[in-house]
């Protein structure tokens, strides 16, 4: 007797299932990982989404929760497993897993613990998806992007740190709020190391091509009577404030990662301030990753925009590079 399926559906052609073209994997299903996953699904940037974590129950629960929203999504396949074989043939892999800093722990010790975690994660990613682009989100992101590059053996253009893409978005939002315009209409960049020592590029900050420096030569400096410099301090402090209020940050970084992924999968050639190898740029001689304006397309970082920076901005970039290198040079097993 024919089944309901056989009575309902008549096969016209036996088509072999093809490999996904835009498969995205998210490693780590914590608050940040799931915000990335949700933003990727909402933007319809993947034809398959894979989730990986060591916590099997949470992993299965998150997958089920997303699958139950399938009617509202355009990503047909969502899979999850602690085994990295589930990530096979990924075009992009987003790494959000990592150790959190413990009270009183040195930055070097935190990074070394993350090296040990990444030594398990990164080779597995490359084993199953040797042609992927890796986006590192885990903090400290610039050092962990360097570690990922070293452990993966991938060319530098295919290892990207989320870097200052979010810092710049926060900067644009806060500056636009003060000016009474939409965030997308203020053009400004934060470069260098993600976080406390990031570098606001006041020399290029503009609205409709009108540089703020041309209106106030002291903008962003200690001599500025309008104290625009305080906006960058708010950008740096904002993550701490959110963590104080809700315990973690996740939505904005999730949206930021999805923004980067859109440029990659759609081959857009958009410019993003993301973490990339900066050796031999701006007088930096060490192998460190910092955020510079990068053109992103389907191969990863296609090129870097050579921004003309003020002398003090270059000095701050070099200082960031020196700080990172002083930690990296003492790492073991990289």
From Swiss-Prot:
The keyword Glycoprotein does not apply. Substrate binds at residues 107, 139, 170, 249. Keywords: Cytoplasm, NAD, Oxidoreductase. Pfam families: Ldh_1_C, Ldh_1_N. The active site is at 194 (proton acceptor). Its EC number is 1.1.1.27. Homotetramer. This is L-lactate dehydrogenase B chain. It comes from Polypterus senegalus.
């Amino acid at each position: 007797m024919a089944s309901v399926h056989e009575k309902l559906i008549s096969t016209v052609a036996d088509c072999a299932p093809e490999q996904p073209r835009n498969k995205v994997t998210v490693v780590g299903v914590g608050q940040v990982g799931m915000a990335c996953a949700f933003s990727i699904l909402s933007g319809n940037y993947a034809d398959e989404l894979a989730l990986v974590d060591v916590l099997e129950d949470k992993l299965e629960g998150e997958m089920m929760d997303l699958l139950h929203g399938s009617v509202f999504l355009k990503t047909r396949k969502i899979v999850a497993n602690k085994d990295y074989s589930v990530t096979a043939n990924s075009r992009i892999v987003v790494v959000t897993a990592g150790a959190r800093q413990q009270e009183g722990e040195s930055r070097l010790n935190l990074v070394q613990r993350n090296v040990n975690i990444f030594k398990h994660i990164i080779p597995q990613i490359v084993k199953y998806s040797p042609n992927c682009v890796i986006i590192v989100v885990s903090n400290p992101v610039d050092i962990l992007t360097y570690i990922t590059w070293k452990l993966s053996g991938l060319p530098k253009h295919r290892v990207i740190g989320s870097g200052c893409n979010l810092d710049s978005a926060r900067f644009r939002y806060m500056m636009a709020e003060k000016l009474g315009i939409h965030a997308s209409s203020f053009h400004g960049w934060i470069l260098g190391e993600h976080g406390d020592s990031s570098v606001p590029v006041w020399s290029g900050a503009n609205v409709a091509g009108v540089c703020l420096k041309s209106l106030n030569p002291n903008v962003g400096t200690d001599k500025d009577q309008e104290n625009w410099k305080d906006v960058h301090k708010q950008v740096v402090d904002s993550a701490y404030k959110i963590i104080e209020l809700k315990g973690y940050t996740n939505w904005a970084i999730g949206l930021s990662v999805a923004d980067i992924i859109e440029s990659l999968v759609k081959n857009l050639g958009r410019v993003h301030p993301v973490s990339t190898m900066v050796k031999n740029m701006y007088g930096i001689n060490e192998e460190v990753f910092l955020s510079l304006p990068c053109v992103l397309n389907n191969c990863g970082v296609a090129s870097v925009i050579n921004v003309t920076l003020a002398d003090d901005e270059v000095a701050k970039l070099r200082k960031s590079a020196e700080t990172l290198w002083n930690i990296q040079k003492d790492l073991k097993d990289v």
